[in-house]
Every structure is written in structure tokens, then in C-alpha cells.
Amino acid sequence: MTSIGATFGINTYSFTQTMRASECLHYLADQGVREVEQMLFPGHLWVSDEGAELAAVRRALDDTGIRLTSVNTSNVELNITAASAEMREVSLGLNERFIAMAAVLGAPALILGPGKANPLFPLSREVLEGHFFSSLDRLMAVALDHGIEIYLENMPFAFVPDAKGMMDLLARYGEDRLKICYDVTNGWFIGEDPVEGLRTVAPRLGLMHLSDTTRATYKHDPIGAGDMDFSAFPQVLSECGYQKSCVLEVISRTPNVDFPASVDQLKHLGY
């Protein structure tokens, strides 16, 4: 297999250090890709690119016919539940600008990290949840103004990394419009059964991320490079009523090889 094709949405993380977003979209379109999760990353597409580059990305989307599933960013660098108000303010301010960019680009959703606790001396759960809920109050207002959905992603480094914990947290917050981007790889890495994770988040499932990892080392490797079993996911997604494309979030220095190979592996499993 020499091209990526249109079976999956493709996250552009692997291209953030080598291509501008507009160039990347044309490259992916030439590979047969029809849906993209657009990363917002300095040098690829960033909040400072509000003029010609943002217009170039919009033109690339129009020219190629690619549809954006969502916009995403390097959430490990941001923290909406940080102990310092200054760090929370920077993180929230950037996310507000990401939402505005999503609206300009025609992306329906922003992928949001729930925030992190200091692993050496964490804030109390009550304080973390308070920061989280206050952050959601602010970001939800901006998202609603722009017609953008927020998909919270399960992340191993988040203060709430698991499917049930996220569902319980969102139930306490009480906003039915908040959805979850369930990353099966992140679920596997923390010891969760991602099949059960998908079933748990089904009422809020907005998007699914795919890549491979082991439980020993955290990766987003090509399919087959880790020890995950992907065979059960198509049936579970059908049970959950999920009808969107899954997004391949493989992070690789050789995406021209690893994306087509990953697609080939998954197609043999019934995707």
C-alpha cells in the first residue's frame, strides 16, 4: 500500500515540524485523505498566523475538499488546572484563540486536555475540580459564541485520566453539550480496557483516536508497533452508534511510511 486513503481521519502531529499546515493539507489530499484533525503548533499553524497563513490554510481546505474533524494542540504544554492563576490564564487564553481559529477554518470541535496535577505534590481533588469547572465555564461560553464543540480527551498525564472518571466529572459539571474524544491508546497505556472505555464514554463520544503503544513506554506509534489489540473496536463502535471516521494520531518521523502501513494493518481487521 503506497497511499493513506480516505478510511480514517489523519492527525497532522507528525508533520508539525516539517510542513506548514497549508502544504500538509495538499500533501494529504494527494494521498487520498478526506478528513484531517488539524494540529495547532508553532511553525505549522499557530495563533500568530492570523493573516496570510490562516487564509492559505482556508484556501487549501477549499481547494482540496478536505473536511476538518477537529483542531488539536500539544496539550502536554498547557494546563487549565495549574496551581498558578498565571499558568491557567495563559492556557485559557490560548484555548480561546484556538476556538476562534477553529471557527475560521470550519472545524466543528476543539480537543481539550482536562488539566494536570503536580505528580510530586498534587493539589487536592476539590481544588483541581474547582479550577477545571471554572475553566470550562469560560471556554464553553467562547465555544458557544463561535459554534464550536469541546471534546475532552482522556490523557495519561491528566488529573482524571480514565473513562469512568471523566464521565463522573462531566456529570458533576452538568453540561450535556460537552463530549469526549476517547483515545484508545491512552486508555491502554494506563491499564484501562479500551473496549470498556469506549462503552463507558459512549453517551458523550464525539471522536476516537487510534495509534499503538505498549504499557511500558508511552507512545503514539504506528499500528503494529505496540502490543494493542485493535480487532474488537469496529464492533464496539457499531454498538455505541458511532458513525464518524476514527482519527489516526500516529506520531512518527516517517509518516509517509507509517500512515499507509497503519491503514493497511487496520483494514485487515475490518475497518
Stretches with model-predicted labels:
Residues 1-9, 17-34, 62, 160-182, ...:
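Histidine-acidic metal/acid-base catalytic patches
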Residues 38-43, 66-69, 99-104, 141-143, ...:
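Short C-terminal domain-edge/linker segments immediately following a structured domain
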Residues 14-16, 40-42, 74-77, 114-118, ...:
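Active-site-proximal loop/turn and secondary-structure-junction residues that shape catalytic pockets
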Residues 37, 70-72, 111, 151, ...:
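Conserved beta-strand positions in the central sheet of alpha/beta enzyme cores
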Residues 22, 60-63, 80-180, 189:
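Active-site acidic/histidine proton-transfer and metal-coordination neighborhood
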Residues 42-46, 77-82, 118-123, 189-191, ...:
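A short acidic, helix-capping loop that chelates divalent metal ions and anchors anionic groups
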Residues 21, 47-54, 85-88, 92, ...:
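Flexible, glycine- and charge-enriched loops at secondary-structure boundaries
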Residues 1-107, 137, 175, 203, ...:
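N-terminal pre-domain/capping segments
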